């Protein structure tokens, strides 16, 4: 019987099942400081041990400072942030879990360091107490976010009961327009599908446009599957995938590598596999994108206009658009290029990989950011990416243009650390969510690609690449 990639991965991990749910084995559990404290506390109260220590890998990322860390955790001024990072360290030591600590050169965002260290590879089931765990599906893995109670369950049993998802194939074919990236593909699809269009589905991204993306680009795409309502996003394994994983620290080696590769090459949807839903997109229809509202599906092309609520499809959407415009302090029919920006953020688990930094640096080379830009940040996704960028002298390009070059972390993606927007500030951000107050109370977020973030920094307004 022909199977989809999702069904192959699920079937390989099922321990027990009924019609709608299945008990599945978890191969890899990624841990950070925000969703794990209560889980570890639950284990301690129940006097439970870990089922399999080696399947866990921890890293602090949400609360870490991106400025000077020379004095370690004590340099964190916010007491809650400091306590969470200290608690993660103590719990990892107590339970014998490998932790990439804050001042380790490998430290970074959990969804960056997983693939980077080879902790993520094809065929795995991967969970983390974070909704953007779908990122890892780019490597042909079954990856999804879980809640704190489930974090405890995985620590204790390496198993989870999960509802079975339906299969959704999103196919994109054709050559991308100039300056269009995986981030633009993701935002465009979310704009067409809506933030609930993928609910209950595992999305497989396919088509020659997706095949031509780098692994970094595929990670960006799968990262944002959750913004379309799907907990799972994935791409079939190909030679790019295998070459990406090869020789990474935690990847298989020797005879295990050869056996793994043989299996990995089967991780694709079979020719006649049944999908419950299918959508087709032509790459030539996708322009650089920017969000204008308070949801990732409130998105238009950068050469477009803020939409008019009177043109909404229904009354619910009309009200939603009106509320978004009111919050964002924008007027309908405003030209996108007339929206003035205060700050720029290039980073997050969506767009902080070396490919993203190269794209932005190429646009910023020999240019300066606009005078009205109060702050422009580049925050690499990991210490390894930071080191590579510095070896390529990308940091000098950013600094010379007026950007600040920071240490790795989640940074301004969310207002949980020192990097946040002030009330009334507007940011062009390469992150993944533009909810009310996401980057700081009363702040305004416009989601963009690294290319558009860089060009907007130069223009001082939301801007296409000139």
From Swiss-Prot:
Its cofactor is [4Fe-4S] cluster. Keywords: 4Fe-4S, Amino-acid biosynthesis, Branched-chain amino acid biosynthesis, Iron, Iron-sulfur, Leucine biosynthesis, Lyase, Metal-binding. CDD domains: IPMI. Pathway: Amino-acid biosynthesis; L-leucine biosynthesis; L-leucine from 3-methyl-2-oxobutanoate: step 2/4. Binds 1 [4Fe-4S] cluster per subunit. InterPro entries: 3-IsopropMal_deHydase_lsu, Acnase/IPM_dHydase_lsu_aba_1/3, Acoase/IPM_deHydtase_lsu_aba, Aconitase_4Fe-4S_BS, Aconitase_4Fe-4S_dom, IPM_dehydratase_rel_enz, IPMI_cat. Coiled coil: none annotated. It comes from the Bacteria. It catalyses: (2R,3S)-3-isopropylmalate = (2S)-2-isopropylmalate. One of its GO terms (molecular function) is metal ion binding. Belongs to the aconitase/IPM isomerase family. LeuC type 1 subfamily. Catalyzes the isomerization between 2-isopropylmalate and 3-isopropylmalate, via the formation of 2-isopropylmaleate. Heterodimer of LeuC and LeuD. This is 3-isopropylmalate dehydratase large subunit. The gene is leuC.
């Amino acid at each position: 019987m022909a199977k989809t990639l999702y069904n192959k991965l699920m079937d390989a991990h099922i321990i027990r099942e009924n019609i709608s749910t299945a008990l599945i084995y978890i191969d890899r559990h990624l841990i950070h400081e925000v969703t794990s404290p209560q889980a570890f506390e639950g284990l301690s109260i129940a006097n439970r041990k870990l089922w399999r220590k080696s399947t866990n890998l921890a890293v602090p990322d949400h609360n870490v400072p991106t400025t000077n860390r020379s004095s370690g955790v004590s340099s964190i001024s916010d007491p809650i942030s400091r306590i969470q990072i200290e608690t993660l360290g103590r719990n990892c030591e107590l339970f014998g879990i490998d932790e990439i600590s804050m001042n380790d050169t490998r430290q970074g965002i959990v969804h960056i360091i997983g693939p980077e260290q080879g902790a993520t590879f094809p065929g795995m089931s991967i969970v983390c107490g974070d909704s953007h765990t779908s990122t890892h599906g780019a490597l042909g893995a079954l990856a999804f976010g879980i809640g704190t109670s489930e974090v405890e369950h995985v620590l204790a049993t390496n198993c989870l009961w999960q509802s079975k998802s339906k299969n959704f194939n999103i196919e994109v074919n054709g050559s991308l327009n100039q300056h269009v990236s995986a981030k633009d593909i993701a935002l465009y699809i979310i704009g067409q599908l809506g933030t609930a269009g993928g609910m209950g589905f595992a999305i497989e991204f396919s088509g020659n446009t997706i095949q031509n993306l780098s692994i970094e680009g595929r990670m960006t795409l799968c990262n944002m599957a959750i913004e379309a309502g799907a907990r799972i996003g994935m791409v079939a394994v190909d030679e790019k995938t295998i070459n990406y994983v090869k020789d990474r620290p935690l990847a298989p080696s020797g005879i295990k590598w050869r056996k793994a590769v043989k299996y990995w090459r089967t991780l694709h949807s079979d020719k006649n596999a049944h999908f419950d839903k299918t959508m087709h997109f032509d790459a030539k229809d996708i322009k650089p994108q920017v969000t204008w509202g308070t949801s990732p599906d409130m998105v238009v092309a950068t050469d477009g206009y803020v939409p008019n609520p009177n043109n909404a499809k229904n009354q619910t959407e009309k009200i939603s658009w009106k509320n978004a415009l009111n919050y964002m302090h924008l007027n309908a029919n405003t030209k996108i290029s007339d929206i003035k920006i205060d700050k720029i953020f290039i980073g997050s688990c969506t767009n902080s990989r070396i490919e993203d930094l190269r794209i932005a640096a190429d646009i910023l080379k020999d240019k300066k950011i606009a005078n009205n830009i109060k702050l422009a940040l580049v925050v690499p996704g990991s210490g390894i990416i930071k080191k590579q960028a510095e070896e390529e002298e990308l940091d000098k390009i950013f600094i010379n243009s007026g950007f600040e070059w920071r240490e790795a972390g989640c940074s301004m993606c969310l207002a949980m650390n020192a990097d946040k927007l002030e009330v009334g500030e507007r940011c062009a951000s390469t992150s993944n969510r533009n909810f009310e107050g996401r980057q700081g109370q009363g702040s305004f977020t416009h989601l963009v690609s690294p290319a558009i973030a860089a060009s907007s920094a130069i223009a001082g307004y939301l801007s296409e690449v000139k």
